[in-house]
Amino acid sequence: IQIPTLCYDPYLSITGACRMCMVETDNNGLVTACSTPVTDGMNIQTHSEKVEERRKEILDLLVSDHDIECMTCEADGNCALQDLAYEYGLDESSYKKESASDRIFDFYKDNEFIELDPNKCILCGKCIRVDQEVQCSDAIDFIERGFQTKVGTTFDEGLDSERSTCVFCGQCVEMCPTGALTYIPSKNKGRSKDFRTEVTTCPYCGVGCQLELRIKDDEIVEVGSVYRDNTPNPAGEACVKGRFGLEFVSHPDRLKKPMIKKEGELKEVDWE
């Protein structure tokens, strides 16, 4: 049974923030499936008319607070919000943004790895939870209040500020369901539909983290997470080297064959 969700992940704590997993029960009416324990005798309807109407209304509200720039968005084709909008036939929100000009946030572009666009954020909190619960960096959290609430850093100073504890692991980008968080090095180099993927072991240290290489034209464009039990990084953990340090693979100076010095010069030889 497919139940839509935007804030749930099996490796994170449950918040029920997006409300998209709403289901109908006999005793309690509409409840969030992720945060409601199953009990004996419970009768649950996952796709009743009432449930579908409420989900579409919730999605309408989420879209009203999201900049729809799918044609130029890096997450186009790999966006959970976009997928649900397509599924529910929602091409634009029926709600008008109140004081929209007062809620245009500045981008975080203070580093060379991660871009944060709060204008696309739906406040699901997945990036915050993976940062605090899996990576344990406590680099980002909800800041401001009410209509001005957004995801940000300490004193809203940016990810690379002196007081920031961000280690640029990229976990927040991997968790983001909307394209509010994207990788800067791979910008304008391709989208998910353009990539072929290969799972490999990170070459940097002896931990053996599993990484997903996203490849286009035989070059590594970006490195994603692998969520697999019985691995050193089951929740997709990675360090800045593993996430952003594999450009050397395609570097023209990379040695691809063994070399031996003959007469004062290095010359390529066979592996045998």
Model-derived regions: residue spans:
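N-terminal export/assembly segments and adjacent metallocofactor-ligating motifs
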Residues: E24-N27, M42-H66, T72-E272
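N-terminal cofactor/phosphate-binding cores enriched in small/glycine residues
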Residues: I1-D40, K50
